[in-house]
């Protein structure tokens, strides 16, 4: 992607879902598939519309084999996404909904480089692996505390420093990983 946000979501046999990966312009869809092996059954969603470059997968595989530069870039992306996947799995298991929502909103804000974007509560519930009522409650608490404004799918981050204080440690961990891999901090 050159702008926007994509998420990778894992779906269980009972239909429940959880986000297991997120990226903006630093990511590459299907990067794990370039390494070979079985197809990964996760689904990719565009969270925030943007632009992306597109190439048939077979052509990308060919270039991956030929180009050291592309291979290094893809391997860096895979390594980064692997670390983030692990952090998000721990986050979804160990942290309450409100700090997870704060973390997630900050990660989106960093990647779209905007403090305002559109997302439905149903979509947020899918990304957080939570019930819609849980997301409604968490978003209401963040809004009551003056950290966000939320109306009809439009989310505006009003106080990013306050939101960072509410966010679980996973936001800082993922942010530091991003800086280590890509040499540039992301800003909320």
Question: Residue spans of the language-model regions?
Answer:
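Glycine- and acidic-residue-biased ligand/ion/polar-headgroup-sensing regions
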Residues: 1-14, 24-27, 44
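Structural motif
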Residues: 5, 50-52, 154
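Short acidic-glycine loop/turn motifs at beta-strand connectors
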Residues: 13, 48-49, 151
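Short, surface-exposed beta-strand-loop junctions and turns on beta-sheet-rich folds
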Residues: 14-16, 60-62, 164
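Cyclic-nucleotide recognition modules
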Residues: 19-79, 83, 87
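Polybasic "coupling" helices that flank or enter modular domains
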Residues: 48-49, 64-130
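Phosphate-/nucleic-acid-contacting segments
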Residues: 107-188
């Amino acid at each position: 992607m050159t702008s926007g946000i994509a998420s990778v979501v894992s779906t269980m046999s009972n239909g429940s879902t959880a986000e297991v990966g997120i990226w903006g312009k630093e990511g590459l869809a299907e990067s794990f598939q370039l390494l070979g092996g079985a197809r990964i059954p996760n689904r990719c969603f565009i969270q925030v519309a943007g632009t992306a470059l597109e190439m048939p997968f077979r052509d990308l595989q060919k270039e991956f084999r030929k180009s050291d530069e592309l291979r290094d870039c893809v391997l860096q992306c895979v390594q980064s996404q692997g670390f983030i996947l692990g952090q998000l799995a721990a986050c979804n298991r160990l942290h309450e909904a409100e700090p997870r929502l704060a973390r997630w909103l900050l990660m989106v804000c960093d990647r779209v480089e905007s403090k305002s974007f559109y997302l439905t509560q149903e979509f947020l519930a899918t990304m957080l692996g939570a019930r819609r009522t849980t997301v409604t409650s968490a978003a209401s608490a963040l809004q009551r505390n003056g950290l966000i404004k939320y109306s009809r799918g439009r989310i505006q981050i009003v106080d990013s420093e306050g939101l960072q204080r509410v966010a679980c440690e996973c936001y800082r961990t993922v942010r530091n990983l991003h800086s280590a891999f890509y040499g540039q901090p992301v800003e909320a």
